Design a protein with these regions (language model features):
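Class I S-adenosyl-L-methionine-dependent methyltransferase catalytic core
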Residues: 1-146
Length: 146
């Protein structure tokens, strides 16, 4: 389990930090400690650089933002921990996160071999697979899954 270490990554640097993390993962070398990846990867949510003032209405802005972000929102680490603690899964139970992103919930499960996850964002799936190699994580749209 990775420790939760609060990070203050400025909005303007998040895309760069994410790209460095993805490069490190793709390289196959341990360039960045897994715990740092867990605490620093932010995904695409909030990285759109769109300004509401550039749109005729809030609705148009929200639609453009939604299209860019694919609805991505990573549940904060503390909330994931608290939710898993409340559920108290036992190690023999299988757990499915149908929109797992980078796998924040998996960090708190008693048995990573019984963790299953889907996500449509290939970058987030790469991070999740790196952080939780024992989990079963697929890049797919759950609406199309058979």
């Amino acid at each position: 389990m990775y420790a939760i270490i609060p990070q203050q990554i400025p909005q303007g640097m998040r895309a760069e930090v994410n790209e460095k993390i993805l490069f490190a993962i793709d390289s196959g070398k341990d360039l960045i400690p897994a715990e740092s990846i867990y605490n620093c990867y932010t995904g695409i949510g909030g990285l759109h650089n769109l300004k509401q003032s550039d749109f005729a209405s809030y609705h148009e802005y929200a639609e453009a933002k939604k299209e860019f972000e694919m609805g991505q929102f990573f549940t904060p680490h503390e909330i994931c921990r608290d939710m898993v603690d409340m559920l108290c899964p036992v190690s023999s139970e299988m757990v499915l996160d149908m929109c797992c992103g980078m796998g924040n919930f998996f960090n708190h499960l008693p048995n990573p071999h019984n963790a299953y996850g889907f996500d449509i964002d290939g970058k987030a799936v790469s991070v999740a697979r790196y952080l939780y190699p024992e989990a079963h994580i697929e890049k797919c749209d759950i609406q199309l899954y058979n």
